[in-house]
């Protein structure tokens, strides 16, 4: 049964969703993908997934994103493309057979 949130209620783990994202003209799936990727940044920091320029990157395969969001892979690819076009992520190849490094960007 669901409970009301009270002052002493501890919230379970959640992925952050910054307020600026709602004004970017993105699909709801693209917002979900961005939120998922932004949530993964904390884990990347803990695991020292930092490039030579000091930028944190995320490794998250399209297959796993699709599973997490209960979607097929083509809509995830479209959402990633939309996020790239808006300048909110950047994908860099990490070599043949390896997953891309995804740099998640935020607005200052």
Feature locations, PLM:
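Short recognition helix of helix-turn-helix/winged-helix DNA-binding domains
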Residues: 1-63
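Winged helix-turn-helix DNA-binding recognition segment
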Residues: 43-104
């Amino acid at each position: 049964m669901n409970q009301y949130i009270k002052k002493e209620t501890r919230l379970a783990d959640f992925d952050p969703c910054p307020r600026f994202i709602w004004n970017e003209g993105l699909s709801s799936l693209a917002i979900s993908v961005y939120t998922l990727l932004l949530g993964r940044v904390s884990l990347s920091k803990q695991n020292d997934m930092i490039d030579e320029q000091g930028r944190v990157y995320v490794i998250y395969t399209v297959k796993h994103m699709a599973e997490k969001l209960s979607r097929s892979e083509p809509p995830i690819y479209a959402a990633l493309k939309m996020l790239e076009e808006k300048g909110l992520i950047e994908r860099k190849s990490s070599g043949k057979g390896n997953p891309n490094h995804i740099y998640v960007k935020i607005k200052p």
